Regions:
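DNA polymerase processivity clamps
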Residues: 1-208
Length: 208
């Protein structure tokens, strides 16, 4: 629980005109933190319902988003990779390093993800500046050789999520998008917690 609240500010947007992104939302044994691009939740019985301002802790008069509608309906057959804590630690370092570079090289503010038989490939490139490729090794489920599964994510948002899940010290399941060509959201799941991350537009992937 402490890990969630310590990281929650990273997943909100306190500067947004949409006040629902300033609040933590409690509903049916779950607390949500969200922005326009990121949704993270924790399963726990908190004994309260409704929305509460993150800064003041006071009840917020905002409309609670319908979070259930944006969570991808994955099942046991869905393609996903399971990363253990030590691999998450390495991936977190890589993503934070890329995010630091992005402050000077805007072309690397996003990274491409590619699911393969060994795990998850993470890569980014800025012509004449930098090229980074990292293979996160994990247990792959649901993948077949004929699949070409790619996605594009905001580097800092992904780094923040991976950092959060690593701090929890459990395995993380990273699901492939259910509709690759539509760049549907990415789904992350661990014991008692999960997240949804919207993709960054990529003309080479999107075909709608």
């Amino acid at each position: 629980m402490v890990t969630f609240f310590k990281n929650a500010k990273k997943f909100l947007d306190l500067k947004s005109a949409h006040e629902e992104y300033h609040a933590l939302h409690y509903k049916e044994g779950r607390v949500y933190a969200s922005s326009a691009s990121v949704l993270v939740w924790l399963d726990e019985e908190f004994g309260k319902r409704g929305s509460y301002d993150f800064v003041t802790g006071e009840k917020a008069d905002v409309r609670m988003p319908e979070f259930e509608k944006v969570i991808p309906p994955v099942d046991a057959r869905a393609v996903h990779v399971v990363l253990e804590s030590d691999e998450l630690a390495k991936l977190c370092v890589v993503l934070k390093s890329i995010a630091a570079i992005a402050a000077k090289v805007p072309e690397v503010t996003s990274v491409r993800l590619h699911w393969d038989p060994m795990g998850l490939q993470v890569e980014t490139e800025a012509h004449n500046h930098v090229s980074v490729t990292y293979a996160a090794t994990g247990r792959v489920h649901g993948y077949t050789p004929d699949m070409d599964i790619r996605a594009c994510a905001h580097t800092k948002h992904l780094a923040d999520l991976i950092g959060y899940f690593h701090q929890r010290g459990t395995d993380l399941r990273i699901y492939a998008p259910l509709r690759v060509s539509n760049q549907s959201p990415l789904y992350f799941a661990a014991d008692g917690t999960g997240s949804v991350l919207g993709q960054v537009y990529d003309a080479e992937i999107r075909q709608d």
